[in-house]
């Protein structure tokens, strides 16, 4: 009774398509895909900025000389 079979999944999928329609599901899928793409892009930018900051911190400091 608690198992999820393939027939149950197909019935649920058919009901979802009937309720929302294919156009709404296509739009929802596109929105979800662009959200995931934006999230991955933000994560990569964050990693790049962290690497840049780490490289700047590891670089030796230059001596400043002051002439009077």
Curated annotation (Swiss-Prot):
Q: Which GO BP terms apply?
A: protein transport by the Tat complex
Q: Name one Pfam family in it.
A: TatA_B_E
Q: Which positions are tagged coiled coil? A: none
Chief location of this protein within or outside the cell: membrane
Matching entries from InterPro entries are given as:
TatA/B/E, TatA/E, TatE
- Residues spanning the membrane: 1-21
Which Gene Ontology cellular component terms are annotated? Answer: TAT protein transport complex
Question: Its topology with respect to the membrane?
Answer: Single-pass membrane protein
Which cysteines does the record link by disulfide bonds? none
Q: Which family does it belong to?
A: Belongs to the TatA/E family. TatE subfamily.
Protein name as catalogued: Probable Sec-independent protein translocase protein TatE
- Species in which this protein is naturally found: Klebsiella pneumoniae subsp. pneumoniae (strain ATCC 700721 / MGH 78578)
Q: Which gene encodes it?
A: tatE
